[in-house]
């Protein structure tokens, strides 16, 4: 419901309009956006009321009703006030026969970016000129805000891309020949981030000359890459060493699993989870988990995250921001309330960035739904990680009865035992 508010008459009716009002439209800009498209190529929904669109009007996908309403309101200078909660359009279903709240309808026209300067008819009333100037100010402020959001999002993406390039070098490499990494998680956290496997400190010469399974070698590198990445988190220096241990034990497997899924999907264009050498995860002879659970069942368990990525076609940027969100998990058991608040504040910044990115690429109407579908992958990622840890515990009960390739007291064991 909305009421029409009579325009205020200003004493200075001779006040000159803004330069935007006087500026004529260049000849090259006379064509509307939809006229430049291929024949019959129209948007599906009106950005204002969500009914069927008939094309682009004032640079926005719109129906004939919203196009006419916006034009008439600007020319007449009418002002409408919503008598509800200013969210009437959010609460209605798409229905062309339903009467829309005029206050919310005009506000949505401005929000989605209808260009008032594209109205070809002259604004002749004083009220219309004042309304147009007000709309122009709002749109200018909105552009400034959008620019600030773009700068924030660009910075986030740039930082994550640089970090991803660094940790991928470590993730897809192996420990130098003749050495193994026997450091505990606590010891690893004492050093600055190291992304080159040849620079890893305190490596241990190999005492057992028996060859280790290549899957275990890459598993260690993948976990180590996730741990090294976590050292770059802004909150890392703000929480205690014990809190870091608790958090990283929980999230490092999540981070490494997501990196492996992204590698297979984005780099190798594969629908199967691959090791860096191209081997399919879980199909290597001699792998105890594969032998105990069965190769097919074990492979299916390992590929749940990849299948979730493929199902909704997660792009590279969405993956990086989503991983940043999930590795900053304030709800990990054992963290103090202060630690949770510190981690949550940083996590919210990345959640905001992901929402802005989805809106930027999928629009105001579809962006939030895309954001929700990405966040909905979280339970799948958590479940896969938990199942992997459960399988590890089961494998440990059998390892005493046969030779096992898992090095004792290593980072891998410490993470999987948590």
From Swiss-Prot:
A zinc finger (NR C4-type) spans 46-66, 82-104. It comes from the Eukaryota. It holds the Pfam family Hormone_recep. Keywords: DNA-binding, Metal-binding, Nucleus, Receptor, Transcription, Transcription regulation, Zinc, Zinc-finger. Induction: Transcription up-regulated in response to intestinal colonization by probiotic Lactobacillus fermentum strain JDFM216. Transmembrane segments: none annotated. GO terms for biological process: cell differentiation; regulation of transcription by RNA polymerase II. GO terms for cellular component: nucleus. Residues 403-414 are annotated as: AF-2. Residues 43-121 bind DNA. One of its GO terms (molecular function) is zinc ion binding. Its main location: nucleus. Residues 174-414 form the NR LBD domain. It is found in: Nucleus. PANTHER family: NUCLEAR HORMONE RECEPTOR. Transcriptional regulator. Plays a role in modulation of lifespan and immunity. Belongs to the nuclear hormone receptor family. This is Nuclear hormone receptor family member nhr-209. The gene is nhr-209.
